[in-house]
């Protein structure tokens, strides 16, 4: 079976000379829940952003569903991007707008302009907004402002917005980095549900190995822009951990969820 995402010899060098990715090659299969781990600056965020071309690679190729993302432009690139949802560390919401409007924005890739979506949302779009907000437990907050929500609730809005794209692939860039441990588990469980129930492939970057072990079906570790480990979460023992994070690193456990915001 052909890979959903195929990355080959991917290099990204920023204008300041930093080589964030140094020849990354990997395949992501459909329905996998892949967790990217590594130190800050190891290339995790850059890799995610190269997959949907929010960052332009310096060289190498990325294909999605057999289409060369690195060569795509115009309408073809827009078609690719609407099939790839993205969840951001800092939520990336329009804080002064309503929760409803933020989630509705996930349909932008299917309409010509934001004005046509905002002024004339279809009945089906409205139904899907409430359906996706219901999935993450905050349909009752639809007409409140996004900035009135807690961090965990704002991230759930981000998940609902990404689901509006009807994606084949969900990219999550440090989605729980600014959340407390219990809320982190709550958000990760929604991503797990999307993966298991909807069959959406998930690639999620995380700081904490304990979360990677709990939710990932596969772990890829980056170090200095290169793949340092690619395998099962259970195969990362203490030796592997120190190879990835350094000899002085100490693993921090994220405790069990109490789901305080559900």
Spans of features found by a protein language model:
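Conserved ABC ATPase "signature" region
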Residues: 67-68, 111, 115-140
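Helix N-cap at the start of a conserved alpha-helix in ABC-type nucleotide-binding domains
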Residues: 181-183
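Catalytic Walker B motif of ABC-type/P-loop ATPase nucleotide-binding domains
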Residues: 170-173
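Helix-to-loop junction immediately C-terminal to a conserved catalytic motif
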Residues: 52
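Conserved catalytic motifs of ABC-family nucleotide-binding domains
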Residues: 166
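Conserved ABC ATPase signature
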Residues: 145-149, 153
